[in-house]
Amino acid sequence: MSKTHLTEQKFSDFALHPLVLEALEKKGFQHCTPIQALALPLTLSGRDVAGQAQTGTGKTLAFLTSTFHYLLSHPAKQDRKINQPRALIMAPTRELAVQIHSDAEALSQSTGLKMGLAYGGDGYDKQLKVLESGVDILVGTTGRLIDYAKQNYIDLGAIQVVVLDEADRMYDLGFIKDIRWLFRRMPAVDQRLNMLFSATLSYRVRELAFEQMNNAEYVEVEPEQKTGHRIKEELFYPSNEEKMRLLQTLIEEEWPDRCIIFANTKHRCEDVWGHLAADGHRVGLLTGDVAQKKRLRILDDFTKGNLDILVATDVAARGLHIPLVTHVFNYDLPDDCEDYVHRIGRTGRAGESGHSISLACEEYALNLPAIETYTGHSIPVSKYNSDALLSDLPAPKRLARPRGGNGPRRNSAPRRGGAPRNNRKRSG
């Protein structure tokens, strides 16, 4: 983590519970990010916090540190039952819930507090088995949480800490009624510590904070610019016919260590995946059609470096905490201006630099003016030589769709260390 991303404030300066401080030190966390430096003094004194911060600013560690400290510093409800968690962390997507749970593991191991995870689409019985043994902190998505609550597998009557992550995204996905349903089953707002984090503190988010929090303090960490000053942005204007060849040429020239390629539809993502897989790249595909177990496996492989490239729809544009993404390619310019910001925000995180490359083709170039108006700046344009683009590329792989599942049967062969591409040449 770059020191330029951190403040002079140290975790050890706070009166944190010794077990929490020990866990942070073991993970190498010494100095706070701006959102941590602003939020922790409030939460450690028992004040509710509504924080505005983009992903990659350290907000997850801010609310996890606060949650673990509070539970270790305050006794559980005396007549608490085994199906009553003490803290609830709500996330808009299963990927984000899994990531939060993973980030909390180090704190859990050092403190002895038990973690639970609840998300839809997969693992119902496995998740339930953990819950039945009793958990202190439950991370989940609203649909699965409501399912378990209605069947009395969980009871929210002993909640002492509640966190709502990416509150604006909750609204976008239509989950606000679910959130209110869950809040109604918790103790009163003044009997729990409440934290809310959002990329924007819009009127509707502030309204939710007013309803469900106890005189929350608002803290805001604005990026120096919406797209991040550490991200180098670049724009090309390819024809539809040259778009794929340009992408593959740029990948060969940049040779990114870890990159995400975004397209606007699942069919376009499948097409991009097919071309890159056929060309020998280690590439994974992440769309809404990919089964949950496979989604998690692909994300794990990408995070561990077993895959170099992830092709994704906007399902992966927000909430995923994947470190060291060096490049983001917008194969399609998004229709939503905010999606552009969230896409390229996958790189240049935690003080690192990043590179964003967008292809403004004939189909989506009309989206560019709105994006540049929203970000407040023009994206630098680069030119390319059509004669220098790669040619003689192999025919794309097609997705095998076995009975009962979708998505590729396996990821492509390793990109590095494989057979040489003797038939590769540039046109012209």
UniProtKB/Swiss-Prot annotation:
Q: Which UniProt keywords apply?
A: ATP-binding, Cytoplasm, Helicase, Hydrolase, Nucleotide-binding, RNA-binding
| Family matches, as PROSITE patterns | DEAD_ATP_HELICASE (PS00039), HELICASE_ATP_BIND_1 (PS51192), HELICASE_CTER (PS51194), Q_MOTIF (PS51195)
| EC number in record | 3.6.4.13
Q: Where is this motif: DEAD box?
A: 165-168
Q: Which reaction does it catalyse?
A: ATP + H2O = ADP + phosphate + H(+)
Q: Where is this motif: Q motif?
A: 9-37
Give the top-level enzyme category: hydrolase
Q: Check the UniProt entry and state the signal peptide residues, or none.
A: none
Q: Which domain of life is it from?
A: Bacteria
Provide the protein's localization. Cytoplasm
Q: Which residues bind ATP?
A: A53, Q54, T55, G56, T57, G58, K59, T60
According to its UniProt record, where is this protein mainly located?
A: cytoplasm
| A GO CC term attached to the entry | cytosol
GO terms for biological process?
Answer: RNA catabolic process
Q: Which InterPro entries match?
A: DEAD/DEAH_box_helicase_dom (IPR011545), DEAD_box_RNA_helicase (IPR050079), Helicase_ATP-bd (IPR014001), Helicase_C-like (IPR001650), P-loop_NTPase (IPR027417), RNA-helicase_DEAD-box_CS (IPR000629), RNA_helicase_ATP-dep_RhlB (IPR023554), RNA_helicase_DEAD_Q_motif (IPR014014)
Q: Which NCBIfam families match?
A: PRK04837.1
Instruction: Cite the record's note on assembly.
Output: Component of the RNA degradosome, which is a multiprotein complex involved in RNA processing and mRNA degradation.
- What task does this protein carry out? DEAD-box RNA helicase involved in RNA degradation. Has RNA-dependent ATPase activity and unwinds double-stranded RNA.
Supply the name of the protein: ATP-dependent RNA helicase RhlB
Organism of origin is Serratia proteamaculans (strain 568)
- Organism classification, top ranks? Bacteria, Pseudomonadati, Pseudomonadota, Gammaproteobacteria, Enterobacterales
Q: Write the gene name.
A: rhlB
